[in-house]
Amino acid sequence: MSSVLRLFKIGAPVPNVRVHQLDASLLDAELVDLLKNQLFKGFTNFHPEFRDKYESELVLALKLILFKLTVWDHAITYGGKLQNLKFIDSRHSSKLQIQPSVIQKLGYGILVVGGGYLWSKIEGYLLARSEDDVATDGTSVRGASAARGALKVANFASLLYSAATLGNFVAFLYTGRYATVIMRLLRIRLVPSQRTSSRQVSYEFQNRQLVWNAFTEFLIFILPLLQLPKLKRRIERKLQSLNVTRVGNVEEASEGELAHLPQKTCAICFRDEEEQEGGGGASHYSTDVTNPYQADCGHVYCYVCLVTKLAQGDGDGWNCYRCAKQVQKMKPWVDVDEAAVVGAAEMHEKVDVIEHAEDNEQEEEEFDDDDEDSNFQLMKD
């Protein structure tokens, strides 16, 4: 093991807390993501196409600002400051804790901030050129083949960098000196800002997180059982009944809020269109009843509107907009007065009976006349 360490020039372990260094890098990444999301939200209603076109440049500018305010000015990142860490020049003794030189800071900014941006642009360019093979003169075809070759080299370089990152991470876990490959190349590392500070473990955040997780799980379990729309409808009906009781007027209680609409107008369509137009009123012509169906309260609505309201009621019914009564059932509306039909039928039956009686009386009178004529003739003979 010692021969392998000497081969890679890995020194002896130092008493640095590895977890703090890894947490510092994670905090820095989360800070960049948080600021990036806030920056992009600013372009939601103001030239969103600019954000989509220059997304990588905006992220680069954000990282440059953070680099200037942290590493360049104070030789530490925000995540490192939260973990009580700072950068030092490892070429000198760790007891001196000399800050990195200007060259080291500049190299850190170029490699960390600008390196990712340049590499993404190079890969995007090579990928776009490798697919450009539609020209007929052969120029673009040759350029595409060269781009594909360069893309393979870039992929191989990415593979080598990933392997180097893995090897450096294993070495970091052993020595605790250099958390990244770039820090190893520049010979800068993280050390505690105050050596006399003791590690204080606070469980306040963990306890708060556990409480919120338990509360969230409880809500996720209980909310589907509450049936909030159904509960809301019951409360609304209860409030309506209280208002009716407070008014104490039977005539007003028997009328709904849209009782003034004509019979041919669907009150549900009228209400929906009025809400869409912001309360400015709806046209009676555009809300006429289509495929009329009759509620059990007697008022007529569109079939689709009535079915939708009853389905939303989930078995609790729905309050009619015209009479404020609870609607539970519906049936097809027939534009025929059954009472009038029954009355007409009874009238026809009475007329038939009267006509039949008159015919019988007329026949009896004719029969009597015939009998009198026959008797008179017999007496004459």
Swiss-Prot record:
Topology feature Peroxisomal matrix, residues: 1-17, 77-100, 176-202
Mode of membrane association: Multi-pass membrane protein
One cellular-component annotation, GO: peroxisomal membrane
Positions with biased composition (Acidic residues): 360-374
Localization, UniProt: Peroxisome membrane
Ranges of the Cytoplasmic topological domain: 45-50, 128-140, 227-381
EC class (word): transferase
Family per record: Belongs to the pex2/pex10/pex12 family.
Name assigned to this protein: Peroxisomal biogenesis factor 2
